[in-house]
């Protein structure tokens, strides 16, 4: 979808609202900022999400109040909505039963608390622009203690840091870095273009992350996750995943260290994949030209790797059922225990240890070589 098509559809959904033009201006600027960062027009629009989802999130907050509230009783807050452009935003826990908003520059935000929804909206006031001066600022929101039901943030270039417990979190940004540290019992969804995403804490609901050139770093306890990046790297360390973790990149590298998961699925086009000290019920890895370096990777059921031209290197890996397939990539390294080995190749050299009655390991190449040994 093109920019104008997106804006026309959004405008139709906002028909009759006195603040529709302000909302359209906001999303128009988001698309243009992403295109300035090098994204194609269609990709910049797609990053914002479906028009229906945007309308569902913002239609209740279209009437923008004009009175700024700095310190107000915070009881009854169930949802926080922030619509920002260039200010860095920090959301954290206060010490009283109030919410407090601190701005580095006053007068740039309209605030209201109505029917349990706290809304902070960047107004049309423009910062003074000078040569070599970046029009930005800081916005800090202090919230009452306890978990709040939902946080919904849309921003352009300002960074976003959340040090507060919520049930659900939805963040959409362009060049914004996003950092979450806390406990989140529901779904967490974050989309950025060039911004980095850093997560640490307890994420008890489904997690969805999508970046273009931005990197992703995760640490903590997770229910399940879907991580996608184009050229950005993805790193997961010191993490436990109750159910499934799916990771997909184009040219970005993937690095997992000390991770336990029910099911682990990794896919990369040209990015390298590096795993160390991994345990999963099922492990499936796929790459075209990226190399795989796997150390102390264990699967309780199946361990499957497929590559086109990338090499597969194994050190102390094992599973009851293993399979490795390449076209021109080589397969080398060691397994912890012997297997019933089977192999096939067109022109590659295959060197495998003697077979044992326990476990299976299938090797397949076209021109790639295979050389495996057993450590026991």
Indicate residue ranges for each PLM-predicted region:
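Intrinsically disordered, low-complexity terminal regions
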Residues: 1-376
